[in-house]
């Protein structure tokens, strides 16, 4: 009986880990991400290199400069999607290497921590109310970002889900 419980728990653990991994990522193919967004009612567009003089790579370099990141490779495609009401959005950078995607993810984590720290500091100083503080934290919870292979994504949870 104990052996069966252990096996059952192991299967449940594997299934839950796989579900998390498979649901938390964006497609590795930019065309599929754009198609999925459109199928879910989003206005979606892809910026590729060659469209506007290597536009995807140029936009990624601008974003990297804002985060003080040095790119080691190039960005091949950027997919953006916005819901019809404008409340949900996602941007996905498809790099030629995972190192650049991870660098963007690390920078976003650091920025989120800074934003939360500053928000708490403003609340503690009495510059914002407790209700405004809680509301801002709730809004931050709706933002999702991460790495999926060589892609870095950020946006609202609903928009990231619409990519899949």
Language-model-detected regions and their locations in the chain:
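A short, solvent-exposed beta-edge/loop patch
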Residues: 120-164
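Gram-positive cell-envelope targeting signals
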Residues: 1-33
């Amino acid at each position: 009986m104990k052996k069966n419980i252990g096996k059952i728990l192991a299967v449940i653990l594997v299934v839950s880990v796989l579900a998390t991994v498979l649901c938390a990522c964006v497609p590795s193919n930019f065309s599929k991400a754009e198609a999925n967004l459109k199928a879910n009612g989003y206005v979606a567009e892809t910026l590729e290199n060659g469209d506007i003089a290597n536009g995807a790579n140029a936009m990624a370099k601008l974003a990297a400069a804002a985060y003080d990141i040095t790119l080691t490779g190039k960005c091949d495609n950027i997919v953006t999607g916005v819901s019809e009401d404008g409340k949900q959005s996602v941007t996905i950078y498809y790099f030629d290497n995972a190192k650049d995607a991870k660098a963007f993810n690390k920078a976003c984590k650091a920025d989120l921590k800074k934003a939360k720290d500053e928000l708490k500091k403003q609340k503690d100083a009495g510059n914002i109310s407790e209700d405004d503080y809680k509301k801002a934290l709730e809004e931050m919870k709706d933002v999702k970002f991460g790495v999926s292979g060589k892609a870095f994504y950020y946006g609202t949870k609903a928009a990231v889900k619409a990519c899949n």
